[in-house]
A protein has these predicted regions:
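Short, acidic, small-residue-rich periplasmic hinge/interaction motif at the N-terminus
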Residues: 21-76, 96-98, 137-139
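N-terminal periplasmic accessory domains that precede
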Residues: 35, 39, 51, 83-86, ...
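Periplasmic plug
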Residues: 63, 94-139
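Outer-membrane beta-barrel translocator/receptor signature
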Residues: 131, 144-152, 160-210, 234-237
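Surface-exposed extracellular loop regions of Gram-negative outer-membrane beta-barrel proteins
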Residues: 155-167, 208, 236-239, 267-271, ...
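Face-selective signature of the C-terminal outer-membrane beta-barrel domain
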Residues: 238-263, 303-449, 473-478, 531-534, ...
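Outer membrane beta-barrel strand-and-loop segments of large Gram-negative receptors
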Residues: 367-371, 417-419, 509-511, 515, ...
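Outer-membrane beta-barrel signature, preferentially recognizing the C-terminal barrel domain
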Residues: 412-415, 456-461, 487-541, 559-571, ...
Length: 730
């Protein structure tokens, strides 16, 4: 008995539980932990222990079917102040050059909140403590839009009745200061939920972006460079109103309105330089350094101001019905209007010469969409899901420039999309599976209203998107194999046919002839105890990338545009491990992706084969009295991505938070990129141009967040935003 008592005491010590006078503090005890409690443990007098509680923690990450599930409730992630802070700690999520988050190799995920597509306002004021778990689905089923690469499903707790509210403010300091304030108020009864939200953000950041292009033209080599320093400012005013009415146990309806007012500006100073080929008969030194130019390098200064305004409104209606025990339906209707405009005066000075350019643009879009989903239960383990959606987007815009070769372009866009899907889900014993098919028809019409050079185009796409998944769950193992096809349609900016002024030596040209990108992915996932792994094969057809060219018929030395490329193949492997050692929760993650891709560029075969790998190590420390600390490190070797080769980056970050008054008041501090090592250096080699640049968005920051809750309830709104995909394209 003595040995057993000592063992229990050691376990209690390693789990950071303190036993004092036979009583154990219960703050922070997980309701979802595996709890073993002995009311009385009789030990020898020498042990002097009257009672011990031993808590075994469930893992923070696990596999469910073909999804990676991150538990939030009663884990250290529940104490993160915002959803963005939580998403940084989900395995396979990466931070991009501008600070946004994406899924490794799959781009930005589509986010669902309780099975409805979430809006940006909803996510900005979501209370992290009300989240149960987050599913990362890298092979979504047929019900999801074909443009969706990955899905994040956020599942929250059920609502409680009463009046609730939350105020949150944060201040983020880097080279400049960003602040945010928000207020959420609501009232919930058994039948009705009414919620209102207002948020204001004053977002500021500086950018340093040096770039250089070595251009190989028929008459020799040109060198163009820019050292760009930008100061950015944007003011966001976001509002949201939700009304949800549970008419009966079988029917629920609701309406949501969102509004966004954005005013922003960018002030930029540049020092540009250039070097023309040596005159005939002189040697051209392609390795010439700037300091060795001996007067052959020319310099000039440029300044620009860019001011933008955006106004958008979005209305969502929904009806949820349960017609019988085995049959249910969901209907969503949306209307959105988006209006934006911007102006950009540019001044370039070289000696006593000065050149001024004014660029302006505006656009207006209306979006109408609807979606219906039906679920038919065949038995406990077998069901059929089917449905359809329709959307219409109409818009017009205008771009104008005082530059001689640009002039004015007026255009119209008209897009209609019709889609239908069917998916079957079933299971027997340890096996579960699903198989689905999705059909999408898209008509895209672009009309150039310019009388001088009309460039009108109408395209029709009819595509089928099959998908399937199968899982095997055993006591210690979990296996999953899944397949999905997706598409990525060009953005309106890429298709518009417009020409954008960058500098006197460079223009950016859109390409109305771009084709959609088609992607095919086969994924195998496995979990064994604390380890999770993944193998993925990806084939990409008609990939869209930047290219730099030297036109012969225009008075400019090089232009950048978009172009479709042939097949890219990627092979990805990923491993994650996490465990709980008392108050310490470490989690380690590593992945590697090898790319096979080559291009025939004006008769030159260029290989872009190469690998990229990354690793991260997160640590959470749960301390007494509701204190929590975190320390994270990540490394990314950059590697080859498409045609671009990136340099390595790394990031050290830490956080600390403390709660009072049963969690109603929370103060959180975080520091990101402590040693300023997130500089994204990239280089691209093409037949005509070697291009390199550094993107320094000053991602290092210190952030203080204060949250006060009137109580812990939340509003209920079960509508789905069926227009979110089209809004994102804008």
């Amino acid at each position: 008995m003595k040995k057993e008592t000592v063992l229990w005491a050691m376990l209690a010590t390693t789990t950071c539980v303190t036993a004092q006078n036979g009583k154990i503090p219960t703050s922070g005890v997980s309701a979802d932990s595996v709890l073993t409690e002995k009311d009385s443990i009789k030990a020898d007098k020498e042990a002097e222990i009257q009672a011990v509680t031993v808590t075994g923690h469930r893992p923070m990450y696990k596999m469910r079917n073909d999804a990676l599930v991150t538990r939030i409730r009663n884990t250290p992630l529940a104490k993160e102040p915002t959803l963005e802070d939580v998403l940084k700690h989900i395995p396979d999520m990466k931070q991009t050059a501008d600070g946004s988050l994406e899924v490794n190799g799959l781009g930005a995920p589509t986010i669902y909140l309780n099975d409805k597509k979430a809006t940006s306002a909803e996510l900005s004021h979501l209370d992290v403590k009300l989240i149960d778990e987050i599913e990362l689905i890298t092979t979504p089923g047929a019900k999801y839009d074909a443009t969706t690469g990955a899905v994040l499903r956020i599942l929250t707790r059920r609502t409680e009745e009463g009046i609730f509210g939350k105020m949150q403010v944060y201040d983020k300091l880097s080279e400049v200061n960003t602040n945010h304030e928000e207020l959420t108020l609501g009232w919930v009864t058994k039948k009705i939920s009414l919620t209102g939200f207002y948020g204001y953000t004053d977002n500021r950041y500086n950018v340093h972006q040096p770039q250089e292009a070595l251009v190989r033209a028929k008459d020799g080599e040109y060198l163009f460079g820019t050292d760009r320093h930008g100061k950015n400012k944007a003011n966001y005013n976001a509002t949201e109103l939700n009304f949800d009415w549970l008419i009966s146990k079988q029917h629920e309806v609701g309406i949501q309105w969102e509004g966004l007012w954005l005013n922003g500006g960018r002030s930029e100073k540049q020092q540009q330089y250039y070097r023309y080929p040596n005159p005939a008969g002189e040697d051209t030194n392609s390795e010439m350094k700037l300091s060795d130019a001996d007067g052959e390098m020319k310099y000039f200064d440029a300044e620009s101001q860019q001011w933008g305004h955006q106004r958008s409104h979005h209305i969502n209606l929904f009806h949820l019905a349960k017609w019988s025990k085995h049959f249910s339906s969901q209907i969503y209707l949306d209307y959105a209007r988006n209006k934006d405009s911007d102006s950009q005066p540019i001044t370039e000075k070289e000696g006593s010469e000065m050149q001024e350019t004014l660029n302006r643009s505006n656009s207006n879009y209306d979006i109408y969409s609807g979606r219906i989903e039906v679920k038919q239960l065949i038995s406990d383990k077998h069901s059929i899901n089917y449905g359809g959606e329709w959307s219409l987007m109409e818009g017009k815009g205008k771009t104008e420039s005082s530059a001689d070769m640009l002039g004015t372009t007026e255009y119209k866009n008209h897009d209609t999309k019709t889609a239908a899907y069917l998916q079957y889900q079933g299971g027997v014993g340890k096996w579960n599976w699903w198989v689905g098919i999705r059909y999408e028809h898209l008509t895209s019409r672009y009309t150039n209203l310019s009388e001088k050079s009309p460039d009108n185009m109408e395209r029709h796409y009819d595509q089928w998107f099959p998908s399937f998944g199968i899982t095997l769950k055993e006591p210690s193992w979990h296996h999953s194999l899944s397949f999905r096809t997706t598409t990525a349609r060009p953005s309106f900016r890429q298709l518009s046919g417009n020409i954008y002024y960058t500098s006197r030596f460079q223009y950016q040209i859109s390409n109305p002839k771009l084709q959609p990108v088609n992607t095919y992915r086969l994924t195998y996932s496995v979990q064994w105890k604390d380890f999770m792994g993944m193998l993925r094969y990806t084939r990409i057809d008609h990939s869209i990338m930047y290219v730099h060219e030297v036109p012969e018929d225009k008075p400019v030395r090089y232009v950048s545009t978009f172009m479709n490329f042939n097949k890219i193949q990627k092979y990805m492997a990923y491993l994650n491990w996490g465990h709980v050692f008392g108050c310490w929760r470490p989690n380690a993650h590593a992945s590697i992706t090898y790319q096979r891709f080559s291009v025939s560029d004006h008769g030159e075969l260029i290989s872009y084969n190469g690998a990229t790998w990354d690793a991260s190590f997160d640590n959470y420390f749960t301390l007494p009295n509701d204190y929590q600390l975190s320390l994270s490190y990540s490394f990314d070797n950059g590697g080859q991505v498409g045609k671009t080769k990136f340099h390595p980056t790394q990031n050290w970050s830490l956080g600390a938070n403390k709660s009072w008054m049963d969690g109603r008041l929370q103060v959180a501090f975080s520091a990101n990129d402590l040693f300023h090592q997130q500089l994204f250096k990239e280089r691209t080699h093409e037949h005509a141009v070697d291009f390199s640049q550094t993107e320094d968005y000053k991602l290092w920051s210190y952030k203080l967040t204060v949250t006060w809750k009137f109580n812990k309830r939340k509003g209920r709104y079960n509508g789905m935003n069926s227009a979110e995909d089209e809004l994102n394209r804008l």
